[in-house]
Regions:
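Basic/polar N-terminal segments that are highly enriched at the extreme N-terminus
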Residues: 1-8, 146-157
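Short beta-edge strand/loop motif at the mouth of beta-sheet-based domains
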Residues: 13-14, 33-69, 156-157
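Hydrophobic/aromatic beta-strand elements that line small-molecule binding cavities or substrate pockets
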Residues: 16, 49, 72-78, 101-108
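Hydrophobic pocket/interface hotspot
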Residues: 25, 35, 59, 76, ...
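Short coil-to-beta-strand transition motifs
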Residues: 66-72, 97-100
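Short, conserved beta-turn/loop elements at beta-strand boundaries and strand-helix junctions
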Residues: 80-85
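Beta-strand/loop substructures that line and gate deep hydrophobic ligand-binding cavities in soluble
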Residues: 86-138
Length: 157
């Protein structure tokens, strides 16, 4: 996946059609037991998920991959079931001087599926944006497989 170009080159958008209801996909995104089954880039896994899914609530996901272990964490800014999540996103290995990035996840209802649209903003560089695009693409591939279909939707970029 290639990040969508922007004025600063630090925002990416990833889309995937998931063969499940919007409610089921939203739950897969907000239930720690389900998140552990799919979240993380190809070849990686989520070992632990602690999530307080409410405005002002915090989350932490501990992950493992061929690059080692790491955690992401942040705060929920908007929770609108089953339509939208907005939250801050930070890696534990990132210096404090770099501001949090922000993720918006939209769950768009289709006839027999849900289109998930992830917009990841405020990234410090194009390279970081490309790394996150790779990670989101792998995560969404695993989420689609969880529901029985790993094919990308037409027009994914």
């Amino acid at each position: 996946m290639t990040p969508a170009p922007t004025a600063k080159g630090t925002t990416l958008q990833v889309r995937r059609t998931i063969p499940a209801s919007r409610e089921a996909v939203f739950r897969a995104w907000t239930d720690p037991d389900v998140v552990r089954q799919w979240f993380g880039a190809r070849g990686g896994s989520t070992l632990h998920a602690d999530m307080d899914v409410r405005v002002g609530g915090r989350y932490r996901l501990d992950m493992e991959s061929s690059m080692g272990t790491g955690s992401i964490f942040g705060e929920y800014l908007e929770v609108t079931p089953p339509e939208r999540l907005v939250y801050t996103f930070r890696w534990d290995r990132v210096p404090v001087a770099i501001p949090d990035t922000q993720v918006t996840v939209e769950f768009l209802e289709l006839e027999a599926a849900t289109e998930v649209v992830i917009t990841h903003e405020r990234q410090p560089s194009r390279a970081v944006s490309e790394f996150h695009a790779w990670g989101w693409d792998g995560s969404l591939e695993k989420l689609a497989a969880l529901f029985g279909n790993a094919k990308e939707a037409a027009g994914d970029g």
